[in-house]
Amino acid sequence: MAQKKAGGSSRNGRDSAGRRLGVKKFGGESVIAGNIIVRQRGTKMKAGANVGIGRDHTLFALVDGHVKFQRRAEGRVHVSVALPEAAE
């Protein structure tokens, strides 16, 4: 015969792992083509010059250069990659 009463069950106790979203390369940082700049859900930030947008709205660099964030009139942040000045 069991010496313990049956334990109750809990209906909580689950959580999903964080999705690692956010800015990966900040303003002024240098990037090479293909580097991920921002991981996001939806288009919180829009792609500007020399920035591509992935199927999951990830923004990535299309060329080598420096990251630039600009807040536009419509309130959205546009992310672009400025080309490095030619060294002479």
Curated annotation (Swiss-Prot):
It comes from the Bacteria. Disulfide bonds: none annotated. InterPro entries: Ribosomal_bL27, Ribosomal_bL27_CS. GO terms for cellular component: cytosolic large ribosomal subunit. Keywords: Ribonucleoprotein, Ribosomal protein. The keyword Repressor does not apply. One of its GO terms (molecular function) is structural constituent of ribosome. Residues 1-22 are annotated as: Disordered. GO terms for biological process: translation. Belongs to the bacterial ribosomal protein bL27 family. PANTHER family: LARGE RIBOSOMAL SUBUNIT PROTEIN BL27M, RIBOSOMAL PROTEIN L27. This is Large ribosomal subunit protein bL27. It comes from Gluconobacter oxydans (strain 621H). The lineage of its organism: Bacteria, Pseudomonadati, Pseudomonadota, Alphaproteobacteria, Acetobacterales.
